Amino acid sequence: MKQHTYIAIDLKSFYASVECRERGLDPLDTNLVVADESRTDKTICLAVTPSLKSYGISGRGRLFEVKQRVKEANAGRQHDAPGHRLDGTSHFFSELQANPSLAIDFIIAPPRMAYYMEYSTRIYQVYLKYIAPEDIVVYSIDEVFMDVTDYLNTYKLSAHDLAMKIILDVLETTGITATAGIGTNLFLCKVAMDIVAKHIPADKNGVRIAELDEMKFRHELWSHQPLTDFWRVGRGIAKKLEQNGMFTMGDVALCSERNEDLLYKLFGKNAELLIDHAWGWEPTTIEAIKAYRPSSNSLSSGQELHCPYEPQKAKLVVREMTDLLVLDLVDKGLVTDQMVLTVGYDIENLTDPARRVKYHGAVETDHYGRQIPKQAHGSINLDGHTSSTRKIMCAVSELFDRIVDKNLLVRRMYVVANHVLPEADAPKKNDGAVQLDLFTDYAAEEEKQKAEDAALERERKIQAATLAIKKKYGKNAILKAMNLEEGATAKDRNAQIGGHKA
């Protein structure tokens, strides 16, 4: 079997680096955080520059956490400064290192998602100068995998040299630096990038490149902690492993030899992936990823509200989300036969004594370890595959009324169109045999069906016209009355990409 060589490239603090470059600043020497300050200090930071991270700031923390950590760091600087005084501020790391009397400052840059996507496209064009698109998988806006097996001989370069050549081209073209991982499979190149590269010194351009094969992985990372540093090991998986005495990938590998059944009992068929990764194995290739076609598909929309909503106001937002989701179905030529709704409740339902005494239902723990009411979840089947706004909106409204506790404040909602498929592939309602009887007026039924078909055709034309207007003049060029009601969010979200300012 041919030995493959893969490269993973991650653009360093991508959003923050773009914002620095657009300001004519060095991303490696500037304290900058990308966050929408207009959403209050609880907003999530989308990116933090490396210099700001050096003060112990997380790359995905909340803005108030960044401010608090900088405040603490400045308190330490003041204690160590001459005369215990800080005189002036700077957001440049080099200036702060040279002058201990300066206070740490940082720039808060509002996100510009559309602009980051443009930058990402330009960088992808650089990748295409070296690697064919069929050998590249775009993992995210700032991360790619490449199968460079057949390119090393062509360029007469090692994998390390090829990775460096590509990264330096990106740096010269855009001013953005990167980290790379090289491995004999996709898992190893990802882990080399995520874990090993972080612990090696960067070169003068801020570039880090690390390499792993199976034996090196076992030698260097079988004792690494925490487990959540590894690709595809989330907090839930790590917690289960730790509860069963496994704290490292070496522990998982040992368990797979001595008690493999335990892993399958804990994780079902997903144990196979975990065991493979514990040994540094990964059989999936980029070619297989490109050829993969899922057996079933869905479209979804999720949203976390800026403040808790009463159920009726939350229902308005769910209806807005459903309306836009249906338009997305129509635009893609898809239909669905099932809608799924998940509604998460706010922590205030349990922290407010007046509300707490009224709630007697199940309680669960969120990611922050806080107690919240158990989320509502349900599904509703439609009368066949459809992309009718009227039918789907009625179904989701009915589902909301059925599953949501009317006494609880809502914080987040997810709407999913399940079993979606191309409209041309959808089974027709009258494909099967029909049982006739003497008591049904089939002429009236036929007229009723004709009227329904005509209504659906009118609705389809309205949907098509709406899409055409939105595409030409913008998503907010045409709005419904509900989008202007108090608490509606669609108008603001139409100006966003991925929930952040475009």
Description of each model-found segment:
Residues 191-192, 351-354, 425-428:
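Short, well-ordered secondary-structure micro-motifs
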Residues 1-276, 282-286, 445-502:
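Gly/Gly-Pro- and Ser/Thr-rich, intrinsically disordered tail segments characteristic of DNA damage-repair
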Residues 8, 103, 229, 239-410:
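DNA-contacting surface of Y-family translesion DNA polymerases
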Residues 18, 369-502:
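Acidic, metal-coordinating catalytic segment for phosphate/diphosphate chemistry
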Residues 12-14, 38-42, 345-350, 420-424:
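Short, charged/polar surface micro-motifs in flexible loops or helix N-caps
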Residues 3-5, 176, 337, 409-411, ...:
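Residues at beta-strand starts and edge strands
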Residues 209-212, 227, 299, 380, ...:
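Short clusters of hydrophobic/aromatic residues that line enzyme substrate/ligand-binding pockets
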Residues 177-179, 340, 414:
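Residues at or immediately flanking beta-strands
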